[in-house]
UniProtKB/Swiss-Prot annotation:
Tumor suppressor serine/threonine-protein kinase involved in mTORC1 signaling and post-transcriptional regulation. Phosphorylates FOXO3, ERK3/MAPK6, ERK4/MAPK4, HSP27/HSPB1, p53/TP53 and RHEB. Acts as a tumor suppressor by mediating Ras-induced senescence and phosphorylating p53/TP53. Changing L337G: Induces constitutive protein kinase activity. Phosphorylated on Thr-182 ERK3/MAPK6 or ERK4/MAPK4; which is the regulatory phosphorylation site and is located on the T-loop/loop 12, leading to activation. Phosphorylation at Thr-182 by p38-alpha/MAPK14, p38-beta/MAPK11 is subject to debate. Phosphorylated at Ser-115 by PKA/PRKACA, leading to localization to the cytoplasm. Autophosphorylated. Keywords: ATP-binding, Coiled coil, Cytoplasm, Kinase, Nucleotide-binding, Nucleus, Phosphoprotein, Serine/threonine-protein kinase, Transferase, Tumor suppressor. Induction: Directly regulated by MYC: expression is activated by MYC, suggesting the existence of a feedback regulatory loop. Its main location: cytoplasm. It comes from the Eukaryota. One of its GO terms (biological process) is negative regulation of TOR signaling. Residues 409-440 form a coiled coil. One of its GO terms (cellular component) is septin cytoskeleton. The active site is at D148 (proton acceptor). This is MAP kinase-activated protein kinase 5.
Length: 473
């Protein structure tokens, strides 16, 4: 409790505009809680990143845990936090928000950085891994599980060759008390015991098995599994576990691979990669948490401390130069995070006839909206619709980009299916409509052979356009 009260005391209630000017149009990126903007300290003209959250207990917990960890050189620093009322253009009145001023990270995300280095070597991958591991160790020594370790949350300080990499976004971090029952995950980075915890949790809720006094839980070791996946992708350019069918939920074949730890080191990409690197991956991707390397074991591993040159150029750099590949790995998987989480709080829905929300009341009176009609769209109440629309577009990218188990009619049919869903939720998008027309789309499927990489790249542009449009409302 004292930590929470100390954190509350550190939050300023004066207006942030007294000390900072905010560029509301320049966005550094978009996370699950909205875009990160640029702000400038008036007294020094120094640029910082500004994250804005609704002032709720969950947001205060995120700030508290991040502040606890932020003293480490490989974790993004929090400069200061303001509690102000902010009214965005789409809102009828101001709302209490936390404005988190953080150090500016100019060097970009991990995969973007790798894509810019045509000669990204195994030694560089080892050095990046060591920095990530040091950040994790700091969190774990404080008994904090990050629970969201993925490439998008690993940022470089600047564009210099020796720029440090730093861990950010503590939105799903928790104190590890052995009771982390709510699985939080992105499919390609999810540990097997997270899936087992989810399976048992769902069965208990359904009354299939009695609730155990000592429920199956998962803990900090899941961060280490995620680290193993990130190392694998850094080394070769694709994830160790993937599915023959791509969707926003984890298919059975992918779930089976994760639960059994079934992955390989294909000769084409891995022949020049050291046995030390393969060894650390194997030891991190152990299915049983007790057999997995600890964070100290990672830091002591020969691969992170080798005096060998390890100057072999990795295939990942070449693969990630293709924007469509990066889109496939990052957008179709990691950016699906917000839509794939099982929320910590249970949500109960009121019957429509008793709802007080004026937007929903109006929709009820209007009934089903006619095709191509215009209807009132509220930014917050419409966020779920927008998320679904973006999900469907990301499913198209996943189907286009990820390795296919087989070619031919089945894969073509699957692409047609995911595109039908994407079109259903994005009919108003002119760019998508024009794209489908140019790709010979007849409303049910593509009549000509599709250049999947080109389609993925255009759909990525559609996502960016739709995201920008929704944020400006």
């Amino acid at each position: 409790m004292s930590e929470e009260s100390d954190m509350d005391k550190a939050i300023k209630e004066t207006s942030i505009l007294e000390e900072y000017s905010i560029n509301w149009t320049q966005k550094l990126g978009a996370g699950i809680s909205g875009p990160v903007r640029v702000c400038v300290k008036k007294s020094t003209q120094e640029r910082f990143a500004l994250k804005i959250l609704l002032d709720r207990p969950k947001a205060r917990n995120e700030v508290r845990l991040h502040m606890m960890c932020a003293t480490h050189p490989n974790i993004v620093q929090i400069i200061e936090v303001f509690a102000n009322s902010v009214q965005f253009p789409h809102e009828s009145s101001p709302r209490a928000r936390l404005l988190i001023v953080m150090e500016m990270m100019e060097g970009g995300e991990l995969f973007h950085r790798i894509s810019q280095h045509r000669h990204f070597t195994e030694k560089q991958a080892s050095q990046v891994t060591k920095q990530i591991a040091l950040a994790l160790r700091h969190c774990h020594l404080l008994n904090i599980a990050h629970r969201d370790l993925k490439p998008e949350n690993l940022l470089f300080k600047d564009n210099s060759l020796d720029a440090p990499v730093k861990l950010c976004d503590f939105g799903f971090a928790k104190i590890d008390q052995g009771d982390l029952m709510t699985p939080q995950f992105t499919p390609y980075y999810v540990a097997p015991q997270v899936l087992e915890a989810q399976r048992r949790h769902q069965k208990e809720k359904s009354g299939i098995i009695p609730t155990s006094p000592t429920p199956y839980t998962y803990n900090k070791s899941c961060d280490l599994w995620s680290l193993g996946v990130i190392i694998y992708v850094m080394l070769c350019g694709y994830p160790p576990f993937y599915s023959k069918h791509h969707s926003r939920t984890i298919p059975k074949d992918m779930r089976r691979k994760i639960m059994t730890g079934s992955f390989e080191f294909p000769e084409e990409e891995w022949s020049q990669i050291s046995e030390m690197a393969k060894d650390v991956v194997r030891k991190l991707l152990k299915v049983k948490p007790e057999e997995r390397l600890t964070i100290e074991g990672v830091l002591d591993h020969p691969w992170l401390n080798s005096t060998e040159a390890l100057d072999n150029v990795l295939p990942s750099a070449q693969l990630m130069m293709d924007k469509a590949v990066v889109a496939g790995i990052q957008q179709a998987h990691a950016e699906q995070l917000a839509n794939m989480r099982i929320q910590d709080l249970k949500v109960s829905l009121k019957p429509l006839h008793s709802v007080n929300n004026p937007i929903l009341r109006k929709r009820k009176l209007l009934g089903t909206k006619p095709k191509d009609s215009v209807y009132i769209h509220d930014h917050e109440n419409g966020a779920e619709d927008s998320n679904v629309a973006l999900e469907k577009l990301r499913d198209v990218i996943a189907q286009c980009i990820l390795p296919q188990a087989g070619k031919g009619e089945n894969e073509d049919e699957k692409l047609n299916e995911v595109m039908q869903e994407a079109w259903k939720y994005n009919r108003e998008c002119k760019l998508l409509r024009d794209t489908l027309q140019s790709f010979s789309w007849n409303g049910r499927g593509f009549t000509d052979k599709v250049d999947r990489l080109k389609l993925a790249e255009i759909v990525k542009q559609v996502i960016e356009e739709q995201t920008t449009s929704h944020e400006s409302q």
